[in-house]
Amino acid sequence: SACNETDNLVLKSPDGKIQLTVTENDNTISYAVNKENAAMILPSKLGFILEHEDSLNHFVIKGTERSSLDETWEQPWGESRYVRNHYNELKVLLQETDGKRKLNVIFRLFNDGIGYRYEFPQQESMDSLVIMSEETEFRMSGTHKAWWIPASDPYYECIATFSPINELDTVRTPLTMETAEGK
């Protein structure tokens, strides 16, 4: 393993106010997010359930890649003509403990939020896959307010529902949240 149980990977937003920590413990990868030293997302696990395959959830960290970007692009319409795309990125290279499959998780921290995505690199042990369920957890630190669209709604072009996160059911992404402190 490139990391042991006490190792943490840390990524900060460009202004340093948001911090992401990725931890490997007992072959489980989790992440947590703080903003201005206050917990926003408590340690939360990553993983998948695949069709006709063992669950993808027993990993070790094999490496990392870091990058940053600060660019401005022009959009044809919208509230702002020019949009700043400014972030720090951490790509975490994962491998199952049996060495069979690989998975990468790419985190991006912006000054006003975070994003993540999974990447299945090309590999001999997996020529195709069907994801039955994404098991990523979001253990929030409080009862935040959220704007969301029900997963059962077939359209994205609808009015978002506003409610406390403890009242959410299955939702579509993106999900927008705000703490009581306005963070």
Predicted regions and their residues:
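N-terminal accessory beta-strand-rich subdomains and adjacent acidic, glycine-rich linkers
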Residues: 8-183
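Bacterial Sec-dependent signal peptides at the C-terminal "C-region" and cleavage site
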Residues: 1-8
